[in-house]
């Protein structure tokens, strides 16, 4: 195992400050927030982000998204004592879908509730007073993780609202995609 492989496997045990120091020294960890935003969150790299999102959302190669605009990553709290969100990358796709991509190196044991909170906060941020619910567009939250949330060998998981007895999907308005152990 080379030095680079050792760094990747050890990165999950570093503090956020240590990861930032490693990045400042020129050691790049591909799931570091700063590096990820630099690589995929800039106007001059929109094609990379579009290709990434299409590959993650449509693994069959259909590449349904044709364009997008970056959107505000900061979501304000919806009530006085509410919690705001600072997301990694947010985009409004050409079809109106909202896509959020998060990278996470460490399992802080709150990932599932935080993921659901981010997904629903982004979805509800579409609505303005007086708007029609039929104007809501689908929201997709993609989480690239350097750890495993679930047992087993599956690394890609898709979650949607569905009937727990039949598995019938209610709608695809809220989709959470999880890609695990991407080191």
Language-model-derived ranges and their functions:
Residues 1-183:
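Elongated, amphipathic alpha-helical interaction scaffolds
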């Amino acid at each position: 195992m080379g030095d680079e492989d050792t760094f990747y496997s050890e990165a999950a045990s570093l503090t956020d400050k240590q990861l930032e120091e490693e990045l400042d020294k020129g050691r790049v960890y591909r799931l570091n927030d700063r590096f990820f935003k630099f690589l995929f969150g800039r106007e001059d790299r929109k094609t990379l982000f579009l290709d990434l999102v299409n590959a993650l959302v449509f693994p069959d190669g259909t590449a349904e998204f044709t364009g997008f605009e970056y959107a505000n990553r900061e979501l304000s709290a919806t009530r006085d004592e509410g919690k705001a969100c600072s997301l990694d990358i947010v985009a409004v796709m050409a079809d109106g879908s909202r896509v959020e991509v998060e990278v996470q190196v460490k399992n802080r044991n709150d990932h599932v509730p935080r993921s659901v909170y981010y997904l629903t906060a982004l979805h509800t941020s579409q609505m303005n007073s007086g708007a029609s619910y039929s104007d809501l567009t689908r929201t997709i939250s993609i989480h690239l993780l350097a750890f495993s949330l679930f047992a087993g060998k599956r690394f890609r998981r898709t979650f949607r609202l569905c009937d727990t007895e039949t598995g019938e999907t209610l709608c695809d308005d809220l989709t959470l995609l999880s890609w695990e152990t991407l080191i």
